[in-house]
Curated annotation (Swiss-Prot):
Recorded GO CC terms: cytosol; glutaminase complex
Keywords: Glutamine amidotransferase, Hydrolase, Lyase, Pyridoxal phosphate
Gene Ontology biological process: glutamine catabolic process; pyridoxal phosphate biosynthetic process; pyridoxine metabolic process
InterPro entries reported in the protein's UniProt record: Class_I_gatase-like (IPR029062), PdxT/SNO (IPR002161), PdxT/SNO_CS (IPR021196)
UniProt cross-references to NCBIfam families, sorted A to Z: PLP_synth_Pdx2 (TIGR03800)
Binding site for L-glutamine: G46, E47, S48, R101, I128, R129
Protein name per Swiss-Prot or TrEMBL: Pyridoxal 5'-phosphate synthase subunit PdxT
Gene Ontology molecular function terms on file: glutaminase activity; pyridoxal 5'-phosphate synthase (glutamine hydrolysing) activity
Oligomeric form and interacting partners: In the presence of PdxS, forms a dodecamer of heterodimers. Only shows activity in the heterodimer.
Summary of the function given for this chain in its UniProt record: Catalyzes the hydrolysis of glutamine to glutamate and ammonia as part of the biosynthesis of pyridoxal 5'-phosphate. The resulting ammonia molecule is channeled to the active site of PdxS.
Catalytic activity: aldehydo-D-ribose 5-phosphate + D-glyceraldehyde 3-phosphate + L-glutamine = pyridoxal 5'-phosphate + L-glutamate + phosphate + 3 H2O + H(+); L-glutamine + H2O = L-glutamate + NH4(+)
Length: 186
């Protein structure tokens, strides 16, 4: 199985390492033609407005939107998968959620902690200017991770979105296995 990592911005190498640790092959996706031959795509963290603009500029936005690929979005990737953020920005709008950007504050407010993750128990989450799910717009959306009363992980069909960075934790590879089992192979 080949999992592509959108390589426009963010911690691409860390995602590639976590994918390999989970037992899959990783491939950088920088251009439209790089989408060929992948079984799923990861949209990493970074700055969501910049990633959205660059995806549009490089022709990736519509291609990804219409690709039917299973997608895991982390941090900014969650924002890009959402239907809205309260500001005008380019989004894929593939998941029936709205998000609050930077819900935990600024860069200096970043933190790490264990969170509850469906079927995995406790998973270590790294939160960096992280968003949270503000509203769930459909019964098709399933909450899979929480930080107290905050929704930090959701799944809808072949799409999964996380507020945190699983690629930055030792046990994060389990989240990639969960994504493959619950979104890619379904």
């Amino acid at each position: 199985m080949i999992i592509g990592v959108l390589a426009i911005q963010g911690d691409v190498e860390e995602h590639e390492e976590a994918i390999k640790k989970a037992g899959y092959e990783a491939k950088k996706v920088k251009r439209v033609e790089d989408l060929e031959g992948i079984d799923a795509l990861i949209i990493p963290g970074g700055e969501s407005t910049a990633i959205g603009k660059l995806m549009k500029k490089y022709g990736l936005l519509e291609k990804i939107k219409n690709s039917n690929l299973p997608i895991l979005g982390t941090c900014a990737g969650m924002v890009l998968l959402s239907k809205g953020t309260g500001i005008n920005q380019i989004l894929l709008e593939l998941m029936d959620i709205t998000v609050k950007r930077n819900a935990y504050g600024r860069q200096v407010d970043s933190f790490e902690k264990e969170i509850e993750f469906k079927d995995l128990g406790k998973v270590y989450g790294v939160f960096i200017r992280a968003p949270v799910v503000d509203k769930i717009l459909s019964d098709d959306v399933e909450v899979i991770a929480r930080d107290g009363d905050k929704i930090v992980g959701v799944k809808q069909g072949k799409y999964m979105a996380l507020s945190f960075h699983p690629e930055l934790s030792e046990d994060g590879y389990k989240v990639y296995k969960y994504f493959v089992e619950n979104c890619v192979k379904k």
